[in-house]
Amino acid sequence: MKSLKIGLAMLLFALVWMAGGTEDAEAVKGDNELIAAFVRNGDLWIKRNNQEKKLAGGPFIRNPRWSFDGKWLAYTKGEFEKELWVLELSTARSSLVHPEGGSRFQWSPSEEKLAYQMNGQLQYVDARSPNKPLGTADGIGNYSWLPSGDGFFASSQSELLPDGWTPIILYRIPIKALGDISQYITVHVLPKQSDDFFAVGTSVFKWSADGRWIAFLATPTASLSADSNTLCVVSADGVVFRTLDEMVNNAQWFEWADRGDHLAYIAGVGREATRNKQLRVLAVTTEKAAEYTPKDFVDQAFAWQGLAHMVVSRAVESKEGSGLSEAAYPYLVRVELENGRQKLITKPSKKHGAYNPIALHSMLAWVKYNGAEADVMLADENGRHAGEWIKRLDIADSYYGQWNWPAVLSFYCSK
């Protein structure tokens, strides 16, 4: 793979401290209509403009997710039960969708319909009648809505037989055919188990902005998937299938740009986020690739800013064998993708870190966390004029340093 390696000396020369200041984050937001759903003390809140409002009480609310039009929120409730709920913002009325449906759920990209999956069964409901499933499909390994919202892209469940695991089939399922496997459209069959490829499941599926490609992780058995999974792409017609790289089982760590066929991901095996994690960007059609993480550093989360820039959460790489005990707090860096130039957005600190960068039109948000308290910061797209916008956010779960901040924070920004 041809790559654009940014050496440490060049990085230190290019890094520029961009002062944050203490300005009111509302001044940065300007006229943009920005709403955040967040979790505080296990309860669900929203912030709109400069007003905060509690919407639903816990215990242990997590995973707030907006409907496509910003009129509904879906969320989970309960640390172990994972009840699935929907809430209509205009009435603040919550409704239970399913007492066990909160593990995998997704809003339709075009309607107020919510899909969820339990034990290999996929169902979807209308948000206004959440207790009446509109369709059901069995034997589903994982799924995502089609970009049009008129069906699903799904994988089958692999089964262990005496001669090995059955291959995984990728389907396109028209919404009217849900439940009738004879009408599922086979897009591609993944390779059988071999020394070069082993998968018994998949992650969710993510479509490129041009609609030509689908990215996903092919995952081995649970004990292996924590450390290494195969990042794959398949063309929308199923003709072309490629394995791209190895990475951890973290669906937040691969994302398409909002235009074209550019895919960014955090590469590197091993479950620790503090070692061997590199930001790479690939133009899938041409296979032109670039790497942006300097030697002795790790990248742990990122956000696209158009096709020209990216913001990444970066930290000094921990020493081999030290695990998380010597993990450094991450800071934000803005990368120019064409030439590799990089600039500091937040200053490296031994007191707090900058996590989960989120691009919001002309703004940039992230989580500031010091090991005990978490706040949401808001700045302009270059990271300037930063200020606290939400205080006392619940602390997200971390798996070997892989932080799941979307479980407690979700933005809706109207265009």
Predicted region positions:
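Sequence signature of WD/YWTD-type beta-propeller architectures
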Residues: L15-K415
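Hydrophobic membrane-insertion alpha-helices, especially the h-region
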Residues: A9-A14
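Bacterial N-terminal signal peptides that target proteins for export
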Residues: M1-L8
